Amino acid sequence: MSSEIMQETTPLVECSAFHRGMSVLEASLRNTEDSEAIISGLLKGAAEFYGASRASVVEADWDLGIGVITYEWCKDGVPAQRNMLQCLPMEKFPRWRKALRANKPVVISDLQRLEKVYPDEAAFFREYGVTTLLAAPFSKRINQGFIAVDDPTRYTDDPVFLFIASYAVVVELNEIKQQQSLLAATKASKYNPEDIHINFFGGMEIISSKGTLTGEDIKAD
């Protein structure tokens, strides 16, 4: 996909690149029915459109105060960070909560300037080697968070492609969790309903006095 998108940023070329990027993305996912494969394809498409090194889905819960990277796509040679970032301290990202509520993008273009206003956020991204970032929020039913691209090199002032990808991602997240809910209901039928708790944040768990079942346990059965 990246080889098919022009580097120039004039309005006409940017519009052409946008439509081309969407066409390539649609063609690559047209016959895909697996939700996780679709999310991976959307992340890849977003990263390639913006010339980014990495794209990820961050699900956030400010009541719990944590965020979790649930899906990630990395360019060849770029290390994955998903396993390292499974409990993001969301108190370090107050402006992200504001962006989610207002349905506005999050942009990092200058870490030094960001550090003057949001030092904790700047320190976090500096630690993980991210110098610039573009993120679009999503919020639907039980899912809320962001789709983000790290170190984008083009179209950084135009988040439309990322917003469209985020809308598609949240649809697939809802589909995944709906399927997990059906599986959970089947598994939970052998427990007393008053004794179980089902948690969907950052995955799926059935918690009871007899122990905990995860989404991976259910898939294995």
Please give the residue ranges for each predicted region:
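Signal-transmission linkers at sensory-effector interfaces
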Residues: 1-37, 175
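Regulatory sensory and allosteric helical modules in signal-transduction proteins
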Residues: 77-116, 120-126, 134
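A short, aliphatic-rich beta-strand micro-motif
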Residues: 131-139
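Intrinsically disordered, low-complexity protein-interaction/activation regions
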Residues: 178-221
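Helix-loop-beta substructure at the N-terminus of cytosolic sensory domains
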Residues: 28-70, 81, 176-180
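Regulatory loop-to-helix N-cap segments in sensory/regulatory domains
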Residues: 2-13, 115-117, 145, 150-166, ...
